[in-house]
């Protein structure tokens, strides 16, 4: 099952699937159905909370358009975690998840749900998913809405990346001492596993707005820079009092309002109905007095701007 877990890939599901179908047919293979997994965590690590949500929504819409065009059923899998930054798949928030990602056939329940929320809540969540994911649904976006989401992805990403690049050394150092709950390759060493902050050229070339495209292209970083796995990254951010859900979100909302007014915000909330609940949850772990002990003054100003504007 192909796993798509970067924003440029999520925005290109249509071309990925159509090429796969056409080449499979040319090779004589019959395709009766397609399963594809949409990663929800790593797009957030790369581009921030809102871009990850909107990227998955565009991917779902494109996948179901492929189903319609080729007559081949598509059964998407949503790979998500329990914290809002990673998808907020919990018993308390499952209605928002299913409303935000209509048409998914499978939702992953990761180990954090079992260990942080307990067996009984995990069992109830599994039963709800078993019942409600059986409903066959489709999902579509108009070209206008899809283009709007693409612009929002660029807006929120530029603020998120510009801040994250300034704190990566601190976050990597903290993440390296986060106690692991399962065996994983380390971020560095002869056998390692790390996340590259993506080159933004693939995203930038999809953006029609010239100013936005240039702003994304200006966020250049040194080759070889590494970031921890998303689990360690989120743990590090929460540990120093700044849930990553806030990074870039407040400034992104403000620019969206400046450009599109109240209707622009209403459109965002319409398609991301859980955003208020996600930010409310993350806000319980916000501790700006603690953050100030770890991060430079410039970053603190950006974070405070995000918090105020949320």
Language-model segments: what does each one mean?
Residues 9-16, 45-50, 85-92, 117-120:
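A short acidic (Asp/Glu
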Residues 105-106, 114-310:
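Acidic, glycine-enriched catalytic cores built around paired aspartates
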Residues 49-52, 87-94, 221-224, 259-265:
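Short glycine/threonine-rich loop-to-helix capping motif typified by GTGT followed
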Residues 43-56, 61-69, 76, 133-145, ...:
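Surface-exposed, charged/polar loop-rich segments
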Residues 1, 5-13, 305-306, 310:
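Active-site-facing alpha/beta catalytic cores
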Residues 1-5, 28-49, 70-86, 103-116:
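Core alpha/beta catalytic barrel or barrel-like domain that forms the active/cofactor pocket
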Residues 13-22, 50-66, 91-95, 126, ...:
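Well-ordered, non-membrane alpha-helical segments in soluble/globular domains
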Residues 20-31, 68, 97-102:
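Acidic (Asp/Glu)-rich catalytic clusters
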């Amino acid at each position: 099952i192909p796993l798509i877990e970067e924003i440029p890939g999520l925005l290109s599901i249509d071309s990925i699937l159509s090429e796969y179908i056409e080449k499979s047919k040319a090779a004589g293979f019959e395709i009766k159905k397609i399963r594809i997994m949409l990663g929800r965590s790593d797009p957030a690590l790369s581009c921030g909370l809102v871009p990850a949500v909107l990227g998955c929504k565009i991917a779902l819409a494109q996948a179901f358009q492929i189903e319609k065009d080729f007559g081949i059923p598509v059964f998407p899998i949503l790979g998500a975690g329990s914290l809002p930054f990673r998808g907020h798949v919990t018993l308390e928030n499952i209605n928002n998840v299913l409303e935000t990602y209509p048409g998914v056939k499978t939702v992953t329940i990761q180990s954090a749900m079992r260990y942080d929320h307990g067996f009984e809540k995990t069992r109830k969540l599994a039963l709800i998913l078993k019942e409600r994911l059986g409903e066959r649904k489709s999902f579509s976006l108009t070209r206008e809405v899809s283009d709007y989401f693409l612009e929002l992805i660029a807006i929120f990403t530029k603020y998120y990346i510009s801040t994250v690049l300034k704190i990566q050394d601190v976050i990597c150092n903290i993440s390296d001492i986060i106690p692991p709950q399962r065996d994983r390759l380390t971020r560095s060493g002869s056998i390692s596993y790390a996340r590259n902050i993506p080159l933004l050229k693939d995203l930038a070339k999809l953006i029609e707005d010239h100013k936005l495209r240039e702003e994304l292209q200006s966020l250049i970083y040194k080759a070889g820079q590494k970031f921890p796995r998303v689990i360690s990254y989120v743990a590090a951010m929460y540990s120093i009092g700044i849930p990553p859900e806030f990074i870039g979100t407040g400034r992104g909302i403000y620019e969206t309002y400046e450009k599109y007014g109240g209707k622009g915000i209403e459109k965002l909330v319409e398609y991301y109905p859980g955003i208020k609940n996600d930010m409310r949850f993350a806000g319980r772990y916000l501790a700006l007095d603690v953050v100030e002990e770890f991060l430079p003054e410039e970053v603190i100003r950006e974070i405070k701007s995000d918090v105020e504007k949320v």
